[in-house]
A protein has these predicted regions:
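Aromatic- and carboxylate-enriched substrate-binding clefts and catalytic-loop regions
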Residues: 251-393
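Short, Gly/Pro- and small/polar-rich lid/capping loops
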Residues: 25-32
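A low-complexity, Ser/Thr/Gly/Pro-enriched, surface-exposed linker/loop concept
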Residues: 51-87
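Bacterial N-terminal signal peptides
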Residues: 6-18
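Short, solvent-exposed loop/turn and secondary-structure capping segments
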Residues: 66-68, 102-104, 111-113, 166-168, ...
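Boundary at the C-terminal end of the N-terminal hydrophobic targeting segment
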Residues: 20-24
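Catalytic and substrate-binding clefts that recognize carbohydrates or anionic sugar/phosphate headgroups
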Residues: 84-222, 229-230, 242-247
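Mature N-terminal segment immediately following signal peptide/propeptide cleavage
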Residues: 33-57
């Protein structure tokens, strides 16, 4: 089994409560040290650690040295390894594994590629297509609609002692300054990472963190007590709720304000009205409902004075509709005449839209007092860039 971890692997320990600008900084050099690279025809092998090897095959012999949405760093201290040709096979050996690839044999298959690992109390041989029967499971994008057991998909750790991460279709991250996402080449290339760690799971996580980038530490308040209920509270009812926590000596750290903070057009389950994006009208919204929150700045200031953080529910899929307070500015900044009432789609993969979205919509609300956002369901799981999930991005 090939672990299609995609961006979730790189974000293994990240939480939605971490502001986007607070990502931890660390070594991010996508091109590996040439001394770690072994080229064999249209195949390339990069020894990243003694337990982690990158395996690439390209029909054109054109290999990827840019960062991807999963892997941002390949420049690490070159581990001790040896390489040689033996009886028509390219052999790469580290202290933890021995890789063998049949010279000139084309795409990676079970007939031309194998990795023997003898580390962490595991002695096994991996080949492409091998089933990972001991995988411990991965992550799930959303729990909406889940009413029982759910398949979590493959994760980073396995009792088999190895994990294969397929990064062949992950979008690239390119550009100077803040990198941006770019569609991967349409060529049918293979770009795999094999972690051979035996039962040393800490080593597996450590090695993967080196290539996927440092994970931001969740803030202290994220581990506290949260209040969340899908209910149309007024600001006074929210304040009474907070006072009740104090009155009964129950700790509270985060106040979650569900979607009725914005205009919902009296949305109820079964509502059939659709917005211009084709979604149920009222799910997406950015304009305060003054019937419930007549003075949002004062309300959030009061919450902060109680020592709490406040988060607002957000369903972004419908973009910026013409009834939003922010619409005229967003439309102009996106080159749309506001008089047309043409909605602005949620094309978050477009760098210009993303800048406008944060400058004109998100950041002004944060200046009012929003600490972070609850990114809720509704958005699709595809974008205009293959392999890019809008929830993750």
């Amino acid at each position: 089994m090939i672990a299609k971890l995609a961006p979730a692997a790189a974000l293994l320990f990240a939480l939605h409560v971490t502001p986007a600008g607070a990502a931890a900084q660390g070594t991010r050099v996508p091109a590996a040290d040439p001394a770690a690279v072994v080229r064999e025809g249209n195949a390339r092998f990069t020894v990243l650690t003694d337990r982690l090897v990158r395996m690439e095959w390209s029909a054109k012999g054109a290999f990827e040295d840019s960062a991807t949405l999963v892997v941002v760093n390949r420049r690490m201290a070159v581990p001790k390894f040896e390489t040689a040709r033996q009886d028509g096979w390219r052999v790469v050996t580290t202290d933890a594994l021995t890789l063998r690839y049949k010279e000139g044999s084309g795409r990676f298959t079970a007939d031309n590629l194998e990795v023997h690992l003898a580390t962490g109390n595991v002695d096994a041989t991996w080949r492409p297509g091998a089933a990972s029967t001991g995988n411990l499971g991965g992550t799930i994008r959303t729990l909406d609609g889940v009413k029982g057991p759910v398949d979590m998909g493959p994760g980073l750790l396995s009792r088999d002692g190895w994990t294969l991460v397929d990064d062949s279709e992950s979008p690239n991250l390119v550009g100077t300054g803040p990198a941006w996402v770019k569609a991967r080449s349409a060529d049918d290339d293979q770009d795999w990472y094999l972690l051979a760690y035996g039962h040393d799971y800490r080593a597996a996580l450590g090695d993967w963190a080196k290539v996927s980038g440092p994970m931001p530490l969740p803030p202290h308040f994220a581990f506290g007590v949260w209040w969340s209920r899908y209910w149309a509270y007024t600001d006074q009812e929210e304040m009474d709720l907070v006072r009740d926590f104090e009155r009964y000596g129950v700790p509270l750290d985060v106040l979650v304000v569900d979607m009725d903070w914005h205009n919902t057009f009296e949305l109820r389950w079964g509502t059939s009205d659709r917005d211009a994006a084709g979604h149920t009208k009222g799910w997406t919204g950015y304009t305060w409902d003054k019937a419930y929150f007549p003075d949002p700045e004062s309300f959030m200031s009061w919450v902060h004075h109680q020592g709490l953080r406040v988060t607002l529910n957000l369903h972004p899929a419908s973009g910026i509709q013409p009834w939003e307070e922010q619409y005229p500015k967003v439309a102009r900044d996106m080159g749309v005449d506001p008089a047309t009432k043409e909605y602005v789609p949620f094309t978050i993969w477009d760098r210009h839209f993303a800048q406008v979205y944060f400058d004109d919509v998100i950041h002004p609300l944060e200046r009012q007092g929003v600490d972070f956002w609850w990114l809720d369901w509704q958005q699709e799981n595809t974008t205009g860039i293959p392999g890019l999930n809008p929830t993750i991005w």
